[in-house]
Amino acid sequence: METLSNSILTVQIAEHGAELQSIKKDGKEYLWQGNAKFWGRRSPVLFPIVGRVWNNKYRHAGNTYEIGQHGFARDMDFKLTYKEDKGAVYWLESTPDTLGKFPFPFRLLVGYLLEENKITVKWRVENLGAMDMYFQIGAHPAFYFPEFDAATKDRGFFVFDRKSDLEYIMPTEKGCVSPERHVLKLNKEGLMPIDIHTFDCDTYIFDNKQLKKITLLDKKKKPHISLEFNSPLVALWSPTKTHPDCPFVCIEPWYGRCDSVGYSGELKDREWIQKLEPKETFDVEYKIIIESVSYTHLTLPTNR
């Protein structure tokens, strides 16, 4: 376990999965602590796929491969390759075992950098092979609802960087998406209220680059945590449908998503697949912002 700190935040990261374990400010924990009653993870890195492939199988170059939900990186031990007080970098390379599930030699680097009240999470994917590589990558951090009280129905609000209603898709019981598109209507203040029934649909998947920032507000509409990202998709998930007393929500920037129901095509033709030519690299990042440090810089949408 490695610890990063500055004058505002203290962050802990595990080598297993290169996964965030803790985000504290003034001794207060912001990152979900992985109680298995609800969900045993905290902030897994999703690679080399996001979500599920149909029937847990996919096809590439005439062969069929089996891979589980969200890939395997989250369950592997990374190596620490760089460390200072405010930053750390972890790396993972393909092995004979991973090549049996994902037939591409790769290197994955995951970096964390503290700057004031922000944590920048950086990913680099390198294609070490001689053929084009097809992959997806995503984040799955979980955060405590502010001022959580299981005896009440309300959990807070989301505010987005756009004021208009949003389109979303959602997974079926088998974890793959159906073609139906749905509209998320925001309230008169441009907010998405969160209560114990908000996630009866399980997951909201916003695609087509609709969003670049999501902020979780407390019940008084004060900013608590924000995520900034450039990913083409972002998901919101909380298991409150099966666990109404669940105290957390996930905000998940994705470069890819699960299969559509019944998909039987090739890996390279999956929706939102990423492609790397031999020796190319893929570099992206997202930011976690502890907004409760200051409420002065975030402007809520005006009434529409």
Where are each of the predicted segments found?
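Acidic-aromatic substrate-binding/catalytic surfaces of carbohydrate-active enzymes
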Residues: 7-64
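Acidic/His-leaning functional-site neighborhoods
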Residues: 9, 25, 65, 70, ...
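Short Pro-Gly-centered flexible turn/kink motifs
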Residues: 13, 58-66, 123, 274-291
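Extended, loop-rich substrate-binding clefts of extracytoplasmic carbohydrate-active enzymes
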Residues: 63-116
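Beta-strand-rich interaction surfaces with strong enrichment in secreted/lumenal proteins
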Residues: 109-111, 271-275
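Active-site/ligand-binding surface loops and adjacent short beta/alpha elements
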Residues: 145, 149-230
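Conserved small/polar residues in nucleotide/adenosyl-binding loops
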Residues: 295-302
